Amino acid sequence: MYDRIGGSSTRTSQTDEPSQSVDSGSFTETLADLAPQWSSRSGELPDKMGACCSKPDTLDANVQTSSASEPSTSSPESPATSLFEYRTADLRDANVDGICVGLTAEWFRNLSNSPSTRMSALTPGSQTHASAAERQQQYQRLKDQLRSRGAGSSQADLQAQNTILEEAGLEPAGEEKRFAFGKSSNVKSMVNEINEDGSNHLLSLYFAEGGAHTVATSASNGTTTLFDPNYGEFTVRSDPDQMASLLQSLANRYRNPNGQHLSTITTQRMQ
């Protein structure tokens, strides 16, 4: 079992990721709307395969990482730095081989540690990073076996993912909730769930181009931290507009410079 997130900081196969300016109004309204759909499996999601690593951005090196004790309180202004204004812990080159499911599992296992310790543990060359790679390989093998037996891509993905999460000592909920990114509905239902104090969620990001990527969130003591294996940790207040703003900035980053358009998010609670 994992613990509540430590420190002061406040599924799917995988592809490339992304930035663009975001308005400073109510993001809960302008994000309009991750229309919730229950994961009925009637519509198959893309298979999670490939390399979910971000394309390098020459400006990334100049982006300041925020203090872990000071989550962002204002909307990002610069297209190049909008996402990184939220960053409270940096992680580089950990996901170049597309092992985001394994890295996310290991991140959950290390929640009781400080942000810097969590990122150090996931650095390439570490034992934890090697373990993440092994979990990813197991996930892929299980998924391939299930597909060969006739399972649909979504069913195979969820079952394989749950298996490796459980073997990592985690307790994933059996089902996922599906949200269509950009459709008119109520984004608050998703961000309120993510922001619930003491909750941990695995989020699968699906892109219109067919790729997918796995990230995670943990909410504790009035702040919510989002972990993206490509970039590190991002932290905001556990406020609907703040969380919606962070998600929009993440979507912007995957669109530019990576050319990936976020279309669907699934959420799975870690019990």
Swiss-Prot record:
GO molecular function: cysteine-type endopeptidase activity
This protein's name: Putative cysteine protease YopT-like blr2140
EC code: 3.4.22.-
Pfam families (UniProt xref): Peptidase_C58
Biased composition (Polar residues): 7-29
Described purpose of this protein according to its UniProt entry: Potential cysteine protease, which may play a central role after invasion of host cell.
Biased composition, class Low complexity, residue ranges: 65-81
